[in-house]
Amino acid sequence: RDVWAKVLKSRSEVGMPYIFFTDNANKGAPQVYKDKGRKIHGSNVCSEIMLSSSEDESFVCCLSSMNLLNYDRWKDTNAVELLAYFLDAVLTEFISKASEIPFMERAVRFAENQRAIGIGATGWHSLLQSKMIPFESLEAQMLNCEIFETMSNQSLEASKKAAKELGEPEMLKGYGLRWTTRHAIAPNTSSAFILGQGSQSIEPFKSNYYVKDLAKFKYTFKNPYLEKVLEEKGFNTDETWDSILLKNGSVQHLSFLSQHEKDVFRTFTEIGAKETVIQAAQRQKYIDQGQSLNLMIPPDTTTKDINSLIIYAHASGIKSLYYQHSVNAAQAFYRKLNECSSCEG
């Protein structure tokens, strides 16, 4: 109990440590792991990787993401299959190059034996806002399930097809599959920006208006879906945007917006943390690895309530929790020191 109290205190102060639910990770592990008694002992720094490691094998991450903003364009195509094949090719190149590098034997052996890949997703909140669907809504939950069920079904068929064409790896002999795992949701911070300033991963926008400070330049972000609504209403003015900036990116003070529009453009701090957990639990059944799941907790939330939320996440089958965000300068500084550039990209 004392250790758990320290964990809760630290997460409230600096957003860490991350939480890894070993039991959920192994309950939701691929069937081949269960059949062969392979255990998942840990994750990566961004907490979305759920792969078995041993004295002989060290897991490697092979990840990429589908842009959910364009879901309607690719849902009935072979885009997921192509991405899976692309990641398989990345594994082949890794095996070829790393085989010649000293002390990489365990990583190469894992890649050869398991060929685990992780197709993720980015732009979830952008998709919802483009359709004027509030994050906290039954419609969002239904679309959430549809998307990840579609991706899972398509990647499973791709794995079967690839096994016939390219062969089964050692661990999957007799299973008719090419990849031990197919899905993992990474943070995708940089990728989301590169793809058109969309929302990152499965996370809500933190603000509708802000200045993004990049390595070589600063970029002013205005939510394009909000800008479209403001333009239609005749309020796409500097005065309106200045007021949004003063409200930390919120639009809840704008009287000319309807309640539905205000709900659509709620920011991460204005969306209940439990809703992000509910949606994560819904999609987890279609994800064989894990999700890099951040929680936004208001600074005045009691430790009892935070504890209850984490217990709820565990009971819902969530495998891990990444950062616990809050309006806290110390957290922002500490997170910057500990980001994983590979996953964040």
What are these regions (language model features)?
Residues 11-111, 121-127, 131, 198-225, ...:
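Function-dense linear segments that define catalytic or interfacial modules
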Residues 44-52, 95-99, 183-345:
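Catalytic alpha/beta core of large soluble enzyme barrels
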Residues 4-7, 12-16, 56-57, 62, ...:
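Short, well-ordered loop/turn elements at secondary-structure boundaries
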Residues 1-38, 120-169, 290:
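Conserved, charged catalytic cores of large soluble enzymes
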Residues 116-134, 305-318:
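Hydrophobic/aromatic-rich, well-ordered segments within soluble, folded domains that form packed cores
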Residues 2, 41-45, 58-61, 75-85, ...:
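Conserved active-site and cofactor/substrate-binding residues in soluble primary-metabolism enzymes
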Residues 82-108, 112, 116, 131-188, ...:
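Internal maturation/activation junctions in enzymes
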Residues 9, 13-20, 72, 89-100, ...:
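Intrinsically disordered or highly flexible coil/loop and linker segments, enriched in small
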